[in-house]
Protein backbone atom coordinates (compact mmCIF):
# COMPACT_ATOMS: atom_id res chain seq x y z
CA UNK A 1 0.00 0.00 0.00
CA UNK A 2 2.86 2.29 0.64
CA UNK A 3 4.10 1.80 -2.89
CA UNK A 4 0.86 2.82 -4.59
CA UNK A 5 1.32 6.60 -4.32
CA UNK A 6 4.79 6.29 -5.60
CA UNK A 7 3.59 4.20 -8.50
CA UNK A 8 0.81 6.67 -9.19
CA UNK A 9 3.27 9.50 -9.06
CA UNK A 10 5.51 7.64 -11.42
CA UNK A 11 2.60 7.02 -13.81
CA UNK A 12 1.52 10.64 -13.59
CA UNK A 13 5.04 11.72 -14.37
CA UNK A 14 5.12 9.46 -17.35
CA UNK A 15 1.83 10.90 -18.60
CA UNK A 16 2.60 14.58 -18.21
CA UNK A 17 6.35 14.67 -18.02
CA UNK A 18 6.66 17.14 -15.13
CA UNK A 19 9.39 15.32 -13.27
CA UNK A 20 12.81 17.03 -13.23
CA UNK A 21 15.23 15.88 -15.88
CA UNK A 22 18.42 14.48 -14.38
CA UNK A 23 21.58 16.43 -15.23
CA UNK A 24 23.26 15.31 -18.45
CA UNK A 25 26.34 13.10 -18.29
CA UNK A 26 29.59 14.28 -19.79
CA UNK A 27 29.42 13.96 -23.52
CA UNK A 28 31.92 12.11 -25.61
CA UNK A 29 31.68 14.90 -28.19
CA UNK A 30 32.93 17.95 -26.30
CA UNK A 31 32.85 20.11 -29.38
CA UNK A 32 29.14 19.59 -29.80
CA UNK A 33 28.34 20.13 -26.09
CA UNK A 34 30.34 23.29 -25.44
CA UNK A 35 27.44 25.62 -26.06
CA UNK A 36 24.93 26.15 -23.24
CA UNK A 37 22.27 23.95 -21.74
CA UNK A 38 23.90 20.64 -22.45
CA UNK A 39 22.26 20.70 -25.87
CA UNK A 40 23.96 19.65 -29.06
CA UNK A 41 24.29 21.61 -32.25
CA UNK A 42 22.91 19.98 -35.33
CA UNK A 43 23.05 21.33 -38.83
CA UNK A 44 22.06 18.09 -40.51
CA UNK A 45 18.51 19.11 -41.39
CA UNK A 46 19.36 22.23 -43.30
CA UNK A 47 22.35 20.64 -44.90
CA UNK A 48 20.25 17.67 -45.89
CA UNK A 49 17.79 19.86 -47.78
CA UNK A 50 20.59 21.81 -49.38
CA UNK A 51 22.36 18.64 -50.50
CA UNK A 52 19.11 17.32 -51.97
CA UNK A 53 18.67 20.52 -53.95
CA UNK A 54 22.24 20.37 -55.25
CA UNK A 55 21.83 16.79 -56.37
CA UNK A 56 24.16 14.97 -54.04
CA UNK A 57 23.91 13.74 -50.44
CA UNK A 58 26.79 13.72 -47.97
CA UNK A 59 24.79 12.20 -45.10
CA UNK A 60 26.34 8.71 -45.31
CA UNK A 61 29.82 10.12 -45.25
CA UNK A 62 29.00 12.37 -42.31
CA UNK A 63 27.40 9.50 -40.39
CA UNK A 64 30.36 7.30 -41.09
CA UNK A 65 32.57 9.66 -39.12
CA UNK A 66 30.58 9.02 -35.91
CA UNK A 67 30.59 5.92 -33.70
CA UNK A 68 27.91 3.33 -34.50
CA UNK A 69 25.69 4.36 -31.60
CA UNK A 70 26.05 8.04 -32.42
CA UNK A 71 25.27 7.38 -36.07
CA UNK A 72 22.10 5.51 -35.11
CA UNK A 73 21.05 8.30 -32.78
CA UNK A 74 21.67 10.90 -35.47
CA UNK A 75 19.56 8.91 -37.93
CA UNK A 76 16.71 8.63 -35.42
CA UNK A 77 16.89 12.32 -34.62
CA UNK A 78 16.87 13.19 -38.32
CA UNK A 79 13.69 11.19 -38.69
CA UNK A 80 11.98 12.94 -35.74
CA UNK A 81 12.78 16.52 -36.76
CA UNK A 82 12.21 16.19 -40.49
CA UNK A 83 9.17 18.51 -40.18
CA UNK A 84 11.37 21.47 -39.12
CA UNK A 85 11.64 24.57 -41.24
CA UNK A 86 14.30 24.40 -43.97
CA UNK A 87 15.40 27.89 -43.05
CA UNK A 88 16.61 26.88 -39.59
CA UNK A 89 20.35 26.69 -39.72
CA UNK A 90 20.89 25.39 -36.19
CA UNK A 91 18.90 22.62 -34.57
CA UNK A 92 19.10 21.98 -30.81
CA UNK A 93 17.88 18.95 -28.96
CA UNK A 94 18.39 17.76 -25.36
CA UNK A 95 20.93 15.15 -24.51
CA UNK A 96 18.28 13.01 -22.82
CA UNK A 97 16.49 12.67 -26.11
CA UNK A 98 19.75 11.71 -27.73
CA UNK A 99 20.30 9.01 -25.09
CA UNK A 100 16.74 7.75 -25.37
CA UNK A 101 17.07 7.39 -29.11
CA UNK A 102 20.33 5.56 -28.66
CA UNK A 103 18.74 3.22 -26.08
CA UNK A 104 15.79 2.52 -28.38
CA UNK A 105 18.12 1.64 -31.20
CA UNK A 106 19.70 -1.00 -29.02
CA UNK A 107 21.80 -1.10 -25.87
CA UNK A 108 24.55 -3.11 -27.40
CA UNK A 109 27.61 -0.99 -28.08
CA UNK A 110 26.09 2.11 -26.49
CA UNK A 111 28.83 4.16 -24.75
CA UNK A 112 26.20 5.46 -22.29
CA UNK A 113 24.87 2.04 -21.27
CA UNK A 114 26.56 2.22 -17.87
CA UNK A 115 24.54 5.36 -17.08
CA UNK A 116 21.27 3.64 -18.03
CA UNK A 117 22.21 0.58 -15.93
CA UNK A 118 22.95 2.80 -12.94
CA UNK A 119 19.58 4.53 -13.34
CA UNK A 120 17.81 1.17 -13.40
CA UNK A 121 19.57 0.22 -10.18
CA UNK A 122 18.10 3.30 -8.46
CA UNK A 123 21.13 5.61 -8.59
CA UNK A 124 21.25 9.05 -10.26
CA UNK A 125 23.77 10.92 -12.36
CA UNK A 126 24.80 12.98 -9.35
CA UNK A 127 26.99 10.13 -8.19
CA UNK A 128 29.19 10.71 -11.22
CA UNK A 129 29.86 14.34 -10.32
CA UNK A 130 30.61 13.50 -6.68
CA UNK A 131 33.72 11.65 -7.76
CA UNK A 132 36.97 13.53 -7.20
CA UNK A 133 37.91 15.44 -10.37
CA UNK A 134 40.99 14.40 -12.20
CA UNK A 135 43.99 16.64 -11.83
CA UNK A 136 44.78 18.86 -14.82
CA UNK A 137 47.72 17.59 -16.87
CA UNK A 138 50.93 19.43 -16.26
CA UNK A 139 52.41 20.77 -19.47
CA UNK A 140 56.18 21.15 -19.65
CA UNK A 141 57.47 24.00 -21.80
CA UNK A 142 61.22 23.66 -22.37
CA UNK A 143 63.07 26.92 -21.88
CA UNK A 144 65.52 28.40 -24.34
CA UNK A 145 68.34 28.49 -21.79
CA UNK A 146 70.01 25.16 -21.16
CA UNK A 147 71.18 23.98 -17.79
CA UNK A 148 74.80 24.56 -18.77
CA UNK A 149 74.06 28.20 -19.61
CA UNK A 150 72.16 28.63 -16.35
CA UNK A 151 75.13 27.30 -14.43
CA UNK A 152 77.41 29.58 -16.38
CA UNK A 153 75.22 32.60 -15.59
CA UNK A 154 75.14 31.74 -11.90
CA UNK A 155 78.90 31.32 -11.88
CA UNK A 156 79.35 34.68 -13.64
CA UNK A 157 77.08 36.32 -11.08
CA UNK A 158 79.31 35.09 -8.28
CA UNK A 159 82.42 36.37 -10.07
CA UNK A 160 81.23 39.97 -10.52
CA UNK A 161 83.25 42.60 -8.70
CA UNK A 162 86.69 44.12 -8.68
CA UNK A 163 89.22 41.48 -9.60
CA UNK A 164 92.54 42.87 -10.75
CA UNK A 165 93.92 41.09 -13.77
CA UNK A 166 90.58 39.60 -14.78
CA UNK A 167 87.70 40.75 -16.93
CA UNK A 168 84.65 40.81 -14.70
CA UNK A 169 81.93 40.64 -17.36
CA UNK A 170 82.44 36.91 -17.88
CA UNK A 171 84.29 34.24 -15.89
CA UNK A 172 87.96 33.75 -16.71
CA UNK A 173 88.80 30.69 -18.81
CA UNK A 174 85.16 29.63 -18.95
CA UNK A 175 85.01 28.86 -15.23
CA UNK A 176 86.95 25.60 -15.66
CA UNK A 177 83.71 23.67 -15.18
CA UNK A 178 82.94 21.83 -18.44
CA UNK A 179 86.02 19.94 -19.51
CA UNK A 180 88.38 22.85 -18.81
CA UNK A 181 91.12 22.58 -16.25
CA UNK A 182 92.90 25.42 -14.48
CA UNK A 183 96.46 26.13 -15.65
CA UNK A 184 99.12 24.45 -13.56
CA UNK A 185 102.87 24.77 -13.32
CA UNK A 186 104.72 22.53 -15.76
CA UNK A 187 107.55 21.77 -13.35
CA UNK A 188 107.80 18.16 -12.33
CA UNK A 189 105.94 17.53 -9.08
CA UNK A 190 104.71 21.12 -8.67
CA UNK A 191 101.28 21.24 -10.31
CA UNK A 192 100.49 24.51 -8.58
CA UNK A 193 97.08 25.98 -9.39
CA UNK A 194 97.62 29.23 -11.30
CA UNK A 195 93.99 30.38 -11.32
CA UNK A 196 94.74 33.29 -9.00
CA UNK A 197 98.31 33.90 -10.23
CA UNK A 198 99.47 36.72 -12.49
CA UNK A 199 98.50 36.69 -16.12
CA UNK A 200 102.12 36.16 -17.22
CA UNK A 201 102.43 33.01 -15.10
CA UNK A 202 99.05 31.68 -16.23
CA UNK A 203 99.92 32.24 -19.88
CA UNK A 204 103.28 30.45 -19.74
CA UNK A 205 102.18 27.84 -17.18
CA UNK A 206 104.91 28.40 -14.64
CA UNK A 207 104.63 29.46 -11.04
CA UNK A 208 106.55 32.41 -9.68
CA UNK A 209 108.99 30.21 -7.76
CA UNK A 210 110.04 28.06 -10.73
CA UNK A 211 110.21 31.07 -13.07
CA UNK A 212 113.16 32.35 -10.98
CA UNK A 213 114.69 29.05 -9.89
CA UNK A 214 118.21 28.29 -11.28
CA UNK A 215 117.41 24.62 -11.94
CA UNK A 216 113.96 23.14 -12.61
CA UNK A 217 113.18 19.50 -13.31
CA UNK A 218 110.54 19.39 -16.03
CA UNK A 219 108.67 16.52 -17.63
CA UNK A 220 111.01 13.75 -18.66
CA UNK A 221 113.52 14.49 -15.90
CA UNK A 222 115.29 17.29 -17.83
CA UNK A 223 117.19 19.89 -15.85
CA UNK A 224 116.20 23.24 -17.34
CA UNK A 225 115.87 26.91 -16.49
CA UNK A 226 113.12 29.36 -17.36
CA UNK A 227 114.33 32.04 -19.79
CA UNK A 228 112.81 35.42 -19.06
CA UNK A 229 113.48 36.65 -22.61
CA UNK A 230 111.99 33.66 -24.43
CA UNK A 231 109.39 32.92 -21.70
CA UNK A 232 110.07 29.19 -21.87
CA UNK A 233 112.38 26.57 -20.43
CA UNK A 234 115.86 25.96 -21.90
CA UNK A 235 118.58 23.48 -21.08
CA UNK A 236 121.24 24.66 -18.68
CA UNK A 237 123.88 24.62 -21.45
CA UNK A 238 122.19 27.60 -23.13
CA UNK A 239 122.76 29.90 -20.14
CA UNK A 240 125.88 31.72 -18.98
CA UNK A 241 126.53 31.11 -15.27
CA UNK A 242 123.47 32.17 -13.29
CA UNK A 243 121.90 34.38 -15.97
CA UNK A 244 118.12 34.31 -16.17
CA UNK A 245 118.14 34.74 -19.96
CA UNK A 246 119.60 32.42 -22.55
CA UNK A 247 122.87 33.25 -24.27
CA UNK A 248 121.36 34.08 -27.66
CA UNK A 249 118.64 36.43 -26.49
CA UNK A 250 120.96 38.11 -24.03
CA UNK A 251 123.48 38.83 -26.81
CA UNK A 252 120.72 40.38 -28.93
CA UNK A 253 119.64 42.48 -25.99
CA UNK A 254 123.18 43.75 -25.36
CA UNK A 255 123.69 44.49 -29.07
CA UNK A 256 120.64 46.70 -29.09
CA UNK A 257 121.88 48.56 -26.05
CA UNK A 258 125.41 49.01 -27.45
CA UNK A 259 124.51 50.62 -30.72
CA UNK A 260 127.18 53.11 -31.98
CA UNK A 261 126.49 56.61 -30.73
CA UNK A 262 128.24 59.83 -31.98
CA UNK A 263 131.27 60.67 -29.84
CA UNK A 264 131.55 63.92 -27.90
CA UNK A 265 134.44 65.18 -30.10
CA UNK A 266 132.48 64.71 -33.31
CA UNK A 267 129.47 66.34 -31.76
CA UNK A 268 131.48 69.37 -30.65
CA UNK A 269 133.13 69.65 -34.11
CA UNK A 270 129.76 69.66 -35.82
CA UNK A 271 128.58 72.30 -33.40
CA UNK A 272 131.58 74.49 -34.15
CA UNK A 273 131.09 74.16 -37.90
CA UNK A 274 127.49 75.17 -37.56
CA UNK A 275 128.45 78.25 -35.53
CA UNK A 276 131.11 79.21 -38.12
CA UNK A 277 128.60 78.95 -40.96
CA UNK A 278 126.17 81.07 -39.01
CA UNK A 279 128.74 83.80 -38.33
CA UNK A 280 129.83 83.83 -42.00
CA UNK A 281 126.25 84.31 -43.08
CA UNK A 282 125.82 87.25 -40.69
CA UNK A 283 129.05 88.84 -42.00
CA UNK A 284 127.88 88.52 -45.60
CA UNK A 285 124.63 90.23 -44.72
CA UNK A 286 126.48 93.09 -42.96
CA UNK A 287 128.88 93.56 -45.94
CA UNK A 288 126.06 93.76 -48.46
CA UNK A 289 124.27 96.37 -46.36
CA UNK A 290 127.46 98.49 -46.04
CA UNK A 291 128.05 98.32 -49.82
CA UNK A 292 124.55 99.53 -50.46
CA UNK A 293 125.08 102.40 -48.02
CA UNK A 294 128.43 103.36 -49.73
CA UNK A 295 126.81 103.43 -53.15
CA UNK A 296 124.09 105.67 -51.82
CA UNK A 297 126.63 108.05 -50.26
CA UNK A 298 128.68 108.18 -53.49
CA UNK A 299 125.59 108.93 -55.51
CA UNK A 300 124.68 111.78 -53.16
CA UNK A 301 128.25 113.15 -53.38
CA UNK A 302 128.11 112.95 -57.17
CA UNK A 303 124.88 114.90 -57.23
CA UNK A 304 126.32 117.52 -54.89
CA UNK A 305 129.44 117.85 -57.08
CA UNK A 306 127.32 118.20 -60.19
CA UNK A 307 125.36 121.00 -58.56
CA UNK A 308 128.59 122.82 -57.63
CA UNK A 309 129.88 122.29 -61.15
CA UNK A 310 126.82 123.82 -62.74
CA UNK A 311 127.12 126.84 -60.45
CA UNK A 312 130.81 127.29 -61.35
CA UNK A 313 130.05 126.99 -65.04
CA UNK A 314 127.38 129.63 -64.77
CA UNK A 315 129.81 131.95 -63.04
CA UNK A 316 132.48 131.29 -65.71
CA UNK A 317 130.07 132.01 -68.54
CA UNK A 318 129.03 135.23 -66.89
CA UNK A 319 132.69 136.24 -66.65
CA UNK A 320 133.24 135.31 -70.31
CA UNK A 321 130.36 137.49 -71.39
CA UNK A 322 131.86 140.47 -69.53
CA UNK A 323 135.25 139.93 -71.18
CA UNK A 324 133.69 139.58 -74.64
CA UNK A 325 131.69 142.76 -74.23
CA UNK A 326 134.85 144.56 -73.26
CA UNK A 327 136.81 143.23 -76.29
CA UNK A 328 134.11 143.52 -79.00
CA UNK A 329 131.24 145.75 -78.03
CA UNK A 330 129.88 145.75 -81.62
CA UNK A 331 129.20 142.02 -81.89
CA UNK A 332 127.21 141.91 -78.68
CA UNK A 333 124.14 140.32 -80.19
CA UNK A 334 125.99 137.51 -81.93
CA UNK A 335 128.08 136.83 -78.85
CA UNK A 336 124.98 136.66 -76.66
CA UNK A 337 123.46 134.09 -79.02
CA UNK A 338 126.60 131.97 -78.91
CA UNK A 339 126.75 132.27 -75.15
CA UNK A 340 123.13 131.10 -74.83
CA UNK A 341 123.87 128.08 -77.00
CA UNK A 342 126.94 127.26 -74.90
CA UNK A 343 124.97 127.70 -71.71
CA UNK A 344 122.26 125.33 -73.04
CA UNK A 345 124.87 122.69 -73.90
CA UNK A 346 126.41 122.90 -70.44
CA UNK A 347 123.02 122.45 -68.78
CA UNK A 348 122.32 119.45 -71.03
CA UNK A 349 125.57 117.79 -69.98
CA UNK A 350 124.85 118.45 -66.33
CA UNK A 351 121.47 116.69 -66.71
CA UNK A 352 123.20 113.70 -68.29
CA UNK A 353 125.45 113.48 -65.23
CA UNK A 354 122.38 113.33 -62.97
CA UNK A 355 120.93 110.34 -64.90
CA UNK A 356 118.56 112.14 -67.30
CA UNK A 357 119.76 111.46 -70.87
CA UNK A 358 118.89 114.10 -73.45
CA UNK A 359 119.64 114.17 -77.18
CA UNK A 360 122.68 116.10 -78.24
CA UNK A 361 122.03 119.74 -79.24
CA UNK A 362 123.72 122.12 -81.61
CA UNK A 363 125.76 123.57 -78.76
CA UNK A 364 127.84 120.38 -78.59
CA UNK A 365 128.76 120.78 -82.24
CA UNK A 366 129.63 124.47 -81.99
CA UNK A 367 131.83 123.98 -78.92
CA UNK A 368 133.99 120.85 -79.24
CA UNK A 369 136.32 122.23 -76.65
CA UNK A 370 133.41 122.54 -74.22
CA UNK A 371 132.86 118.76 -74.53
CA UNK A 372 136.43 118.27 -73.40
CA UNK A 373 135.76 120.57 -70.51
CA UNK A 374 132.65 118.59 -69.64
CA UNK A 375 134.59 115.33 -69.83
CA UNK A 376 137.15 116.82 -67.50
CA UNK A 377 134.34 117.70 -65.14
CA UNK A 378 133.13 114.07 -65.34
CA UNK A 379 136.55 112.84 -64.35
CA UNK A 380 136.60 115.44 -61.61
CA UNK A 381 133.23 114.12 -60.37
CA UNK A 382 134.58 110.58 -60.29
CA UNK A 383 137.58 111.86 -58.36
CA UNK A 384 135.19 113.56 -55.97
CA UNK A 385 133.45 110.26 -55.32
CA UNK A 386 136.75 108.48 -54.77
CA UNK A 387 138.36 111.20 -52.63
CA UNK A 388 136.36 112.16 -49.55
CA UNK A 389 138.23 115.46 -48.95
CA UNK A 390 135.95 118.44 -49.53
CA UNK A 391 138.86 120.90 -49.84
CA UNK A 392 140.40 118.86 -52.64
CA UNK A 393 137.10 118.96 -54.51
CA UNK A 394 136.82 122.73 -54.14
CA UNK A 395 140.39 123.25 -55.41
CA UNK A 396 139.74 120.99 -58.39
CA UNK A 397 136.62 122.97 -59.25
CA UNK A 398 138.55 126.24 -59.12
CA UNK A 399 141.16 124.90 -61.57
CA UNK A 400 138.45 123.73 -63.93
CA UNK A 401 136.77 127.12 -63.76
CA UNK A 402 140.03 128.87 -64.65
CA UNK A 403 140.51 126.52 -67.60
CA UNK A 404 137.02 127.18 -68.82
CA UNK A 405 137.59 130.96 -68.54
CA UNK A 406 140.79 130.70 -70.57
CA UNK A 407 139.04 128.59 -73.21
CA UNK A 408 136.30 131.16 -73.53
CA UNK A 409 138.81 133.99 -73.97
CA UNK A 410 140.67 131.90 -76.59
CA UNK A 411 137.44 131.40 -78.52
CA UNK A 412 136.77 135.13 -78.52
CA UNK A 413 140.24 135.88 -79.83
CA UNK A 414 139.90 133.17 -82.50
CA UNK A 415 136.64 134.65 -83.75
CA UNK A 416 138.18 138.07 -84.17
Curated annotation (Swiss-Prot):
Expressed in stems, leaf sheaths, and young panicles. Zn(2+) 1 binds at residues 185, 190, 207, 210. It comes from Oryza sativa subsp. indica. This is Squamosa promoter-binding-like protein 8. The keyword Iron does not apply. One of its GO terms (molecular function) is DNA binding. Residues 261-273 have a biased composition (Basic and acidic residues). Probable transcription factor that plays an important role in building the laminar joint between leaf blade and leaf sheath boundary, thereby controlling ligule and auricle development. Residues 11-53, 250-299 are annotated as: Disordered. A motif (Bipartite nuclear localization signal) lies at residues 243-259. The keyword Transcription applies. Keywords: DNA-binding, Metal-binding, Nucleus, Transcription, Transcription regulation, Zinc, Zinc-finger. One of its GO terms (cellular component) is nucleus. Zn(2+) 2 binds at residues 227, 230, 234, 246. The SBP-type zinc finger is required for the binding to DNA. A zinc finger (SBP-type) spans 182-260. It is found in: Nucleus.
